[in-house]
Amino acid sequence: MDVLKNPVPRLLNKAHHNIDVSKISDGANFVIRTLKSSGYDAFLVGGCVRDLILQNDPNDFDVVTNAKPNEIIKIFGRQSRPIGKRFKLVHVRSKDEVTEVSTFRRMPRRIKSDKNFRKRLKGDNEFGSISEDVFRRDFTINALYFDIDQKVVIDYVGGFYDLTDRKISCIGNPFERFEEDPMRILRAIRFATTLKLSMKNISLAEFSRCGGLLSNLSAARLFYELEKMFLRGSAAVVFNELVGLNLIHFLFPILDRNNMEDPVYKRSLDTIKIALQITDERVKMGQSANLAFLCAVILWSALKIEIQNLRCQITDESLIFDIAAENIISNQIKTIAIPRRVSNIMREIWKIQSVFENPTRRDANRLLQNRRLRAGYNFFVLRSKTEDYLTDTVDWWRKFFVVAKKMNKLPFPESQTYRL
């Protein structure tokens, strides 16, 4: 990577950026002003600056400073908590808000004979200045700093103009940046699709060349990224891009292209896309979205096939579902660390599908007390779009819910059920 020795930033005032400072959270303001009053520099950085320039409401605010982690903790005391294995960060709590604070970093001193430079780069804690820190960041649009007192955007790498041109560009050589941290592959796709940006110096060939690196990512980091990809209103377009680039199987191995020849998986792909579209609509309307529901949809076809396979090996039908669900979830968490709070909901949604498929009035009345009734029913309605034999049964349940509503037994508004 070519790093300028003495980079000169562009200082862009409000006439250029038009940032609405009232959108900056109280917590971020508190952290920055406290650091400055203690004699340190502090700026907003990264995605929050990008979103403010685009006139979007940031999901969270990150602060960067020349104070080292131990100094940050000393300043904020019990309000702070150190985090991070790859690089030491500090979370500062102010009321109900948590602000992530990092220290300026620099590139490690590279020795020509150091063959493990890239590996060292992933875990270093070498502190630096703002002009060095900028070259540790992934994309130009995420390498913008904002001074809340001067109200200026500090731009070392042309990120502001990439934003105005609707471009996403790696800082330095894309392959090297992806090799340093393969998560940047997924982030590039997420930013390009959600912000409607075109790739500037990143080609489809780079994704194909680097896709295998995704296997090196920790399962915990992948779950965190999955939440961002699927719960922020652009899940369908992100998913379609991952499928088109043949990268989706690095997240969900069951969606490997070889499996797509199986009719069960083909139907499943259509169901997944419908579920993601509905999730996006809910997010845009300010309604809740459930990652457990989406994971249950994505892994459903694998569960059905696993159940079929186990029936050839196990005679006790009562054991088959639990074993199959455990096998599918255990295999998936090797790639994405789905936490138990999520996987338990998935199991519950799956388990009541048998009641929806073969309802009796007695079982249906019992199901009215089940906390996963609405999620399970919506899942069942989704399935009916690609599993035609379920259509009549969906009608049965709709009539049942009408009666339950009249008797004040329906535990949720009928408007919260899917009508596809």
Go through the PLM ranges and name each one.
Residues M1-L420:
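Catalytic cores of the polymerase beta-like nucleotidyltransferase superfamily
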